[in-house]
Amino acid sequence: MTDESKPTDDQPTSKGRQGARWGQERRLEFIDYRLRWDGQINRSSLTDFFGISVPQASLDITEYAKLAESNLEYDTRARVYRATESFKAVFPSSAVERYLDDLLRVAVQPEIPYGSFLGWQSPVAAVPKLGRRLNADIVGVILRAIRETGFIEVFYQSLTDPEGGERMLSPHALVHDGNRWHVRAYCHKRKAFRDFSLTRIKCCKYVGQDRDRADEDYAWNTMVNVVLTPHPGLTPAQRKLIENDFLMEGGEMHVECRRALLLYLLFQLNLNEDQADQRPEVIQLALKNRDEIKDLIQY
């Protein structure tokens, strides 16, 4: 088995329905997750998912009961353990954010194996995203350069240069702007750190060792405090609703963002200057310290 094909916690082996050779702590997380989101669990849930024996499943449930005795009770008629009214999740993996993320990943990309703990699944739909095809070999070379502090030679296309050309890059991080993936790299042609869309890199070759340049990327290492408030054009009741949505304190929300990613954040929040003429109900938020950070935005 190659390194690339070795199973991880999120992509188990095929011994069980979802895998085996999982430590007991992982199985306890599974019990906690299923009780929280399915409201019940039995031994077959564990044996089917992990490929373990029935006696081992019984031991795992007993061990979980030691951790949180008040979280479950046995239904003798249905022969299942049910979550109690006083259930309190033991593990962070049972958080609502994790559960909804699991649902979304399965709904959006059902063809991709994903070792979630999902059992019963609510019907779910997601707004379609436009597909951007990524080249796994190119990503692999980029990751090698990041891992080994090397530099790469790429053929890169952009809207300003749609025909494309060769670039020498020293990458140090990957970036997701909420819509697509980029690599953050020092461009030896432009003598500056920039973001390069992974889908616009048409070929990529590892050249050799470079020095670690991450500390030289000032915009990457500079954190900016973004202060958000409800849009002033909203009614008082609407502003209160927005405050509750975003857990604001004193009518404000503070977000720490890398300077290099500031433009992406503002675009996501409809706070880019090009979006300023939209209705308050659409924008919903306002940038309180715009004057303070406007010169920090990198276009």
Curated annotation (Swiss-Prot):
Q: Where is this region: Winged HTH domain?
A: 1-95
The ranges of region (Probable ligand-binding region) come to 156-200
Query: Which residue ranges does the record annotate as region WCX domain?
Result: 208-299
Q: Which residue range or ranges hold the WYL domain?
A: 131-211
* One Pfam family matching this protein: WYL
Q: Which GO terms describe its biological process?
A: defense response to virus
* UniProt note: domains: Has an N-terminal winged HTH domain, a central WYL domain and a C-terminal WCX domain; the WYL domain of each subunit reaches into the other subunit to form swapped domains. Crystallization in a pH 5.0 buffer alters the relative positions of the domains, suggesting a mechanism for DNA release.
Under which name does UniProt file this protein?
A: DNA-binding transcriptional repressor CapW
